[in-house]
Amino acid sequence: MKTLNRRDFPGAQYPERIIQFGEGNFLRAFVDWQIDLLNEHTDLNSGVVVVRPIETSFPPSLSTQDGLYTTIIRGLNEKGEAVSDARLIRSVNREISVYSEYDEFLKLAHNPEMRFVFSNTTEAGISYHAGDKFDDAPAVSYPAKLTRLLFERFSHFNGALDKGWIIIPCELIDYNGDALRELVLRYAQEWALPEAFIQWLDQANSFCSTLVDRIVTGYPRDEVAKLEEELGYHDGFLDTAEYFYLFVIQGPKSLATELRLDKYPLNVLIVDDIKPYKERKVAILNGAHTALVPVAFQAGLDTVGEAMNDAEICAFVEKAIYEEIIPVLDLPRDELESFASAVTGRFRNPYIKHQLLSIALNGMTKFRTRILPQLLAGQKANGTLPARLTFALAALIAFYRGERNGETYPVQDDAHWLERYQQLWSQYRDRVIGTQELVAIVLAEKDHWEQDLTQVPGLVEQVANDLDAILEKGMREAVRPLC
């Protein structure tokens, strides 16, 4: 069986116009996949040079396959049908290592056609590294490497304003474009680079903040033989991802034309502020996960897919989203409902086995950031507590007993909460405290909740009543009236 390469698998090759820091699965099934579609359907005509930003030889370089690889996009489409679509990606031309090919790296700045910089260097990638110097070959941090490359560009083209770049980081931190820009400016000042360069950074370059959303499951180790048999070739860089994707970019409106999105629309939004989209994702996608996990797991289910195929649990989650989360969010209702519909479709994806226990990690913090804001907003708007979000809190407290049907399961959270719950449930079993007192102690933890939740009218009583129902009747019976 042949391995992918451009000689045996000839096809389109595009001039290099995009630099990409990061060779991982996510960017390859997200950014490069989208660029490949735009190259095929429009005159974007842009090839990608991947820069490996860290010093490692694993995995091997994409250049061993001349930049070619296959994405397999699988999930439920808009009609709820299971689809699996294999695509040979031709948008990547080559990969270079900034450590072993530093001169080649700097040379990227000399190409007049270069226009875009994408990156995913993990959440820790957009950070300051104190020892980084201008003459390092290379500097350690990604922002320092980028500063050096931008200065090379500035110098080579004598500060030409039409030679700036559109810089689009995909790292999972809030306002990633702003954070990256601040660090580039910090290095420029620390390295005493000319004032003209700092002005050029501002005038000629755009740093765009983003929100990225797609579950990328990566190399399908267990299915490789079967998939390669179907494809008819060997691919060491096979990359699998879910059907859904969303790319929200906070940037100039002209970006839609530059990326040719006006000619071939993708699920890419160019917006003035990513904040409401971030809130939507956290509240609906992450919030639904967090509400679902303790309820579904204690109802005897193990994966998100099983939960969504269970009529009662599915109804509980959908009612929580549509009746309690969406009404308090600040975006047009039709947009929110369309996103929510995509979310429940993603939860049903038959190709992804998402273990409930793995999502349960750090459940207390997740509840505070993902559900509490909507619970409090609902109480404020209606004068009553949202029943399902409140029940989810009771289910979460019950989950920290660490026992289901007489069998123990691992609970993962910070040491404070693990010790706290061990102590509280032990006191409950010894009849030192009742449910109302147990709930009040949890809700009074100001350091965690950033407020005293026992002051929210009726919250302690409602959570305690729900907890009583769970303990006395079991999760199935307790949740039924809310389904």
UniProtKB/Swiss-Prot annotation:
Pfam families: Mannitol_dh, Mannitol_dh_C
Source organism, top-level taxon: Bacteria
Alphabetical list of SUPFAM superfamilies matching this protein: 6-phosphogluconate dehydrogenase C-terminal domain-like, NAD(P)-binding Rossmann-fold domains
Single biological process term from Gene Ontology: D-galacturonate catabolic process
Binding site for NAD(+): I18, I19, Q20, F21, G22, E23, G24, N25, F26, L27, R28, A29
Pathway: Carbohydrate metabolism; pentose and glucuronate interconversion
HAMAP family (alphabetical): Altron_oxidoreduct
Family: Belongs to the mannitol dehydrogenase family. UxaB subfamily.
The name this protein goes by in its record: Altronate oxidoreductase
